[in-house]
């Protein structure tokens, strides 16, 4: 079983690339794992395991990053750090992030918010506040 650090750099190892140490530190610090890098999965909480997965996805600096509920099992502080890192990935590194979330706070950092209902696009808006997202969700709910 791999350590958290080995797991994070696995995509680089598979392609015989080495990690840029400054970027690796940035990613590890952003997800708060600097003290857990030598731990194996059984020694990590569910949230810590999710943070390893987020770091592993970011380590290669892909042009497009798909994030499915990236803050789902994280506390609000760590979730905020992950969202900050995703935002920085867009603003500083020119990456595109496509995020699926039910969290209005997470959606509010996006440049574009698309609402789906019954498999169809109901609304496609540029930047929305958290409150506007909540109001939109309320308007899309199916009456019981």
Feature map (PLM): residue ranges:
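Short coil-to-helix segment of the ABC ATPase nucleotide-binding domain corresponding to the Q-loop/switch region
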Residues: 2-9
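ABC-type ATPase nucleotide-binding domains, specifically the catalytic core motifs of the NBD
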Residues: 9-21
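Conserved ABC ATPase signature
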Residues: 40-50
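Conserved catalytic motifs of ABC-family nucleotide-binding domains
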Residues: 61
């Amino acid at each position: 079983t791999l350590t958290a650090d080995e797991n994070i750099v696995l995509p680089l190892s598979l392609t015989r690339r080495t990690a840029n140490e400054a970027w690796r530190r940035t990613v590890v610090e952003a997800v708060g794992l600097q003290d857990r890098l030598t731990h194996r999965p059984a020694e990590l909480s569910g949230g810590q395991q999710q943070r390893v997965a987020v770091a592993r996805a970011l380590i290669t600096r892909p042009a497009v990053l798909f994030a499915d509920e990236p803050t789902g099992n994280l506390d609000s502080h760590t979730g905020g750090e992950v969202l900050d890192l995703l935002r920085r990935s867009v603003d500083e590194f020119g990456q595109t992030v496509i995020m699926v979330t039910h969290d209005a706070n997470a959606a509010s950092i996006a440049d574009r918010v698309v609402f789906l209902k019954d498999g169809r696009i109901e609304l496609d808006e540029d930047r929305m506040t958290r409150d506007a997202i909540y109001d939109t969700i309320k308007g899309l709910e199916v009456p019981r």
